[in-house]
């Protein structure tokens, strides 16, 4: 039926391509005209386009000319000219869609077209890749095009930011790779101010979070999120969609409970009855716990709970789930997952220095620096017996889903997106357009071979590799885990077949190994998508063979002359071209998949390594009924029974029915994972709206020069709240006393002489006005004491500090809410509706807590800075006294005498000599005359606080030092204001019970 409708109505993708064809023809028509322009005339097109945009034309109006300009500039600078299909890809990207372009079709070159066009608006455009190397190489390779046309190009990495400058030579870069040598270091802000910025998804996201933790406007690096092209868009927006970016800080130290629970769960026995049988057939588990492999969840049986209660020595009559023991369930759950679900060399690896490093499920790459949250990483560390690192508290977090949806226009490109088009449309509002290849695809995708056991499958893989290796065809073997890649490597070694292994443990030479995987007789074992972004050239890459040819001549990259390098490169090129032709005659690259992935597009990515740009090639998947996908989602038992009865273990099945079964299993998993991600984004959207409100408030505080009135308004609201709380109709003296006690928590300068008696006889309105007048007077005095300029900074710092402190607590509370809210489903309530209701209530509390945090800390914060000012002024007063005190010796001559200090030099953080037990800065700093009396010594000068009031010179010094403090704050040398010795923690609005 669907095929009939497609024939009747036409394929929507073909319609879209036909619609774009006239634009391509217009660009081609402009080709000769632009080819006739001089370099200067072609370069001047950029200014012309900018002016036309300023005059009211749109990007669509100038698209044909802009694309023709880039095409000609690319031809003149890097010797590449965009094909028509690449022009189509560029138009699709400009329109904010996803362009599916097969491996080797030149996505890096395609991106130059929409990047140039959209950069003309002057708002900054981003090219997002999956790793630093691809970002730097891509920007450096295309850099000459942008530079020729007068655009600036920036690059950001984890520990580097730079601008493309052809006149700059990086002494530390490989001089043979021109893509890497012309990067001039710059600040991160400068890299973002470039017309075009290349970087990774992680760095763009983390910079956004860091910007929203900044305390000064000068610390911001990103501009408004305008336009981005996401390379490998399926990897970033789908595979990584549920992975949140988290900036964290240290929390409490890790508990010994992790090690204790790791030992306890080893004594538990897994049930042979599966989760599916428990749910669908009502069977009872025959062990202490059972595993739902589909959701990667673990459930304790009644027997298991009783066993744990015995092992934990919980007293009779009490339960593991009682409040006093409930905390342990969190550790038990993580210990069970670490022991029975997360496998070493599949989900993580342990480095030689004892660090647990996560392995990316989709790429097989190690991800150093990333940690599982919520205690899972600590549980795995306890399982492996390595050092357990402290838990962290989340300071800021965002998912890729929410970060990339903030761009005004978003586009993406990848080799495999069509199977996920529904998800791209529903979550990101992105349409997928399949771009035709420049040359016809002639790769042969052979039928799957399915074996009963894993052992039979791997034996068949070995036989196929031997056959291909004997005739000289290069082979790429794709695996789903480090463990599998090492198992195959061991088999190849025993068979005497030379090969390269590329997995999380051997990633250093990733690009080099993949680039040479197309040489004659090469055998490469790689985990999923390793080397993605690097083309496999049949015959090999001459750049990678350069060192080998130089070594034969007794030379190295460093010692060879340019002429020797050029000669060696020509030899390498000739060899790779000849070898490439031979490999093509043999049939090209043969790709072997050792297991089907949950997502069909991951399988397609592996197949896509062969047959690039019209080259010959082939692919085949070898499967077994013991593979995880079939075990979890396929009707294994029925098929296995048939195979055991009718087929020898070494004979594969190639039935079309099984192919449909496998594809059906993959479709079900894709649907399930889509639902999970959709469910995740529905919950995240609630948090995202709240994040946007908080971050917008932070930005307003950074942008606003004077927050005085806002702070006073917050204080007035808090006083009103205190009066409403304490002074109910017919209030008594005790109520007035409680009110004054509450007010002094905001403003401790209220004289002790002000008592309930002072306020007796006044109305509520008169009392409120009395306190407001006193508060405003105090505020004005504090402002004079620290100078108005510094007061503005104190206001900003206290407000930002309050937002950040309360936001961190809120993130923790929301995380707990999200974990527990799913229990609402058991009460026949929609968890999402309940989550929204509860989170809105908590968000109102958050706003109240932020306001009260500001109110209770603003005045104490001024004393913190004034104490610092007093210390500086005191030192200046003493220096003045030492230099200028004079006396007569009786002969009329003036004798200069040094002014002696009658009290010893005391550091601010030393204990005060008065014996109070407090630090000097919290006790007698500024009241040295009192301290001198206590120590039976007369002070040599009036106290610094008096000198500040009486001496114009020291008042000037205070203003100068205030300016210095302001400068230090702006440069990040002084920390944000937190609570102070005189300050008190603001009372929080109760959030309800925590788990």
Curated annotation (Swiss-Prot):
Residues 883-911, 939-995 are annotated as: Disordered. ATP binds at residues 86, 104-108, 535. Keywords: ATP-binding, Cell membrane, Cytoplasm, Membrane, Metal-binding, Nucleotide-binding, Protein transport, Translocase, Translocation, Transport, Zinc. It is an enzyme of class 7 (translocase). It catalyses: ATP + H2O + cellular proteinSide 1 = ADP + phosphate + cellular proteinSide 2. Pfam families: P-loop_SecA (PF21090), SEC-C (PF02810), SecA_DEAD (PF07517), SecA_PP_bind (PF01043), SecA_SW (PF07516). Residues 957-969 have a biased composition (Low complexity). CDD domains: DEXDc_SecA, SF2_C_secA. It comes from the Bacteria. GO terms for biological process: intracellular protein transmembrane transport; protein import; protein targeting; protein transport by the Sec complex. It is found in: Cell membrane; Cytoplasm. GO terms for molecular function: ATP binding; metal ion binding; protein-exporting ATPase activity. Its cofactor is Zn(2+). Its EC number is 7.4.2.8. PROSITE patterns: SECA, SECA_MOTOR_DEAD. InterPro entries: Helicase_ATP-bd, Helicase_C-like, P-loop_NTPase, SEC_C_motif, SecA, SecA_CS, SecA_DEAD, SecA_motor_DEAD. May bind 1 zinc ion per subunit. It is a peripheral membrane protein. The keyword Kinase does not apply. Zn(2+) binds at residues 912, 914, 923-924. Part of the Sec protein translocase complex. Interacts with the SecYEG preprotein conducting channel. Has a central role in coupling the hydrolysis of ATP to the transfer of proteins into and across the cell membrane, serving as an ATP-driven molecular motor driving the stepwise translocation of polypeptide chains across the membrane. NCBIfam families: PRK12904.1, secA. Belongs to the SecA family. Monomer and homodimer. Part of the essential Sec protein translocation apparatus which comprises SecA, SecYEG and auxiliary proteins SecDF. Other proteins may also be involved. This is Protein translocase subunit SecA. It comes from Chloroflexus aurantiacus (strain ATCC 29366 / DSM 635 / J-10-fl). The gene is secA.
């Amino acid at each position: 039926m669907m095929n009939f409708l497609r024939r009747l109505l036409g394929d929507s993708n073909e319609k879209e391509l036909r619609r774009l064809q006239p634009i391509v023809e217009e660009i081609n028509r402009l080709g000769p005209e632009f080819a006739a322009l001089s370099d200067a005339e072609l370069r001047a097109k950029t200014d012309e386009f900018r002016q036309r945009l300023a005059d009211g034309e749109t990007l669509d109006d100038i698209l044909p000319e802009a694309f023709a300009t880039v095409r000609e500039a690319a031809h003149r600078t890097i010797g590449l000219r965009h094909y028509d299909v690449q022009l189509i890809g560029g138009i699709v990207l400009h329109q904010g869609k996803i362009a599916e372009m097969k491996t080797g079709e030149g996505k890096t070159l395609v991106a130059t077209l929409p990047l140039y066009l959209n950069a003309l608006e002057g708002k900054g455009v981003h090219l997002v890749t999956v790793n630093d190397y691809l970002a730097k190489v891509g920007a450096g390779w295309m850099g000459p095009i942008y530079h020729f046309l007068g655009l600036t190009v920036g690059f950001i990495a984890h520990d580097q930011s730079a601008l493309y400058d052809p006149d700059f030579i990086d002494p530390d870069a490989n001089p043979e790779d021109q893509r890497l040598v012309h990067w001039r270091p710059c600040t991160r802000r400068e890299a973002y101010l470039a017309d075009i910025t290349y970087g990774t998804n992680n760095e763009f996201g983390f910079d956004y979070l860091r910007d929203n933790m900044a305390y000064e406007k000068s610390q911001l690096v990103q501009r408004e999120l305008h336009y981005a092209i996401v390379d490998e868009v399926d990897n970033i927006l789908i595979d990584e969609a549920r992975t949140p970016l988290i900036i964290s800080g240290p929390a409490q130290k890790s508990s010994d409970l992790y090690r204790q629970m790791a030992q306890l769960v080893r004594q538990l026995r897994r049930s042979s009855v599966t989760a599916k049988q428990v749910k669908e057939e009502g069977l009872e588990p025959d062990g202490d716990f059972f595993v739902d492999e589909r959701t990667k969840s673990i459930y304790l049986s009644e027997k298991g709970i009783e066993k744990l209660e015995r092992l934990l020595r919980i007293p009779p009559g009490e339960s593991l789930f009682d409040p006093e023991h409930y905390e342990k369930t969190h550790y038990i759950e993580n210990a069970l997952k670490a022991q029975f679900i997360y496998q070493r060399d599949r989900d993580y690896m342990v480095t030689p220095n004892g660090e647990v490093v996560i392995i990316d499920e989709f790429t097989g790459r190690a991800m150093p620096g990333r940690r599982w949250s919520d205690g899972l990483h600590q549980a795995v560390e306890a399982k492996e017996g390595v050092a357990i690192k402290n838990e962290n508290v989340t300071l800021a977090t965002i998912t890729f889903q929410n970060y990339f949806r903030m761009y005004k226009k978003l586009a993406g490109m990848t080799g495999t997106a069509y199977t996920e088009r529904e998800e791209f449309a529903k979550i990101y509002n992105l349409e997928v357009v399949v771009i035709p290849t420049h040359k016809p695809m002639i790769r042969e995708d052979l039928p799957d071979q399915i074996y009963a056991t894993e052992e039979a499958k791997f034996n068949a893989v070995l036989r196929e590799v031997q056959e291909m290796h004997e005739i000289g065809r290069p082979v790429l073997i794709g695996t789903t885990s480090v463990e599998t890649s090492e198992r195959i490597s061991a088999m190849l070694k025993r068979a005497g077949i030379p090969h390269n292994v590329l997995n999380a443990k051997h990633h250093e030479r990733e690009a080099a190994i993949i680039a040479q995987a197309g040489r004659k007789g090469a055998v490469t074992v790689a985990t999923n998508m390793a080397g993605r972004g690097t083309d496999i050239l049949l015959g090999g890459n001459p750049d990678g063979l350069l060192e080998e040819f130089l070594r034969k001549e007794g030379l190295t990259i460093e010692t060879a002359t340019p002429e020797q390098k050029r000669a060696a490169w020509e030899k390498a090129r000739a060899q790779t071209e000849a070898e490439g032709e031979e490999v093509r005659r043999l049939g090209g690259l043969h790709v072997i998949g050792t297991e089907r992935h949950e997502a069909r597009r991951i399988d397609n990515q592996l197949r896509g390594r062969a047959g690039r740009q019209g080259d010959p090639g082939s692919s085949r998947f070898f499967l077994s009924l013991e593979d995880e996908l079939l075990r979890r989602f396929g009707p294994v038992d029925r098929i296995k029974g048939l195979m055991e009865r009718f087929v020898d273990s070494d004979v594969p099945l190639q039935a079309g029915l099984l192919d449909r079964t496998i594809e059906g299993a993959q479709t079900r998993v894709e649907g399930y994972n889509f639902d999970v991600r959709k469910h995740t984004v529905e919950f995240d959207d609630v948090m995202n709206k709240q994040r946007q409100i908080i971050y917008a408030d932070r930005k307003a505080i950074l942008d606003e020069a004077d927050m005085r009135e806002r702070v006073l308004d917050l204080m007035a609201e808090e006083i009103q709240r205190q009066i409403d709380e304490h002074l109910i109709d017919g209030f008594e003296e005790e109520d007035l006393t409680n009110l004054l006690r509450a007010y002094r928590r905001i403003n401790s300068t209220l004289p002790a002489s002000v008592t309930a008696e002072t306020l007796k006889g006044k109305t509520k309105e008169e009392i409120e006005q009395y306190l407001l007048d006193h508060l405003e007077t105090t505020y004005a005095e504090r402002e004079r004491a620290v100078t108005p300029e510094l007061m503005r900074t104190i206001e900003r710092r206290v407000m930002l500090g309050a937002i950040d402190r309360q936001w961190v607590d809120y993130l923790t509370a929301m995380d707990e809410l999200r974990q527990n809210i799913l229990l609402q489903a058991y009460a026949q309530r929609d968890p999402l509706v309940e989550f929204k209701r509860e989170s809105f209530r908590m968000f109102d509390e958050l706003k109240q807590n932020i306001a009260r945090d500001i109110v209770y800390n603003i005045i104490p914060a001024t004393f913190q800075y004034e104490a610092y000012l007093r210390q500086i002024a005191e030192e200046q007063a003493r220096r003045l006294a030492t230099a200028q005190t004079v006396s007569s010796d009786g002969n009329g001559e003036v004798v200069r005498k040094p002014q002696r200090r009658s009290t010893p030099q005391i550091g601010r953080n030393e204990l005060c000599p008065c014996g109070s037990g407090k630090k000097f800065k919290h006790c007698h700093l500024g009241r040295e005359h009192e301290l001198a009396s206590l120590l039976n010594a007369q002070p040599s000068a009036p106290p610094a606080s008096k000198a500040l009031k009486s001496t114009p010179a020291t008042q000037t010094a205070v203003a100068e030092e205030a300016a210095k403090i302001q400068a230090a704050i702006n440069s990040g040398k002084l920390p944000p204001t937190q609570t102070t010795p005189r300050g008190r923690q603001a009372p929080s609005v109760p959030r309800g019970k925590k788990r």
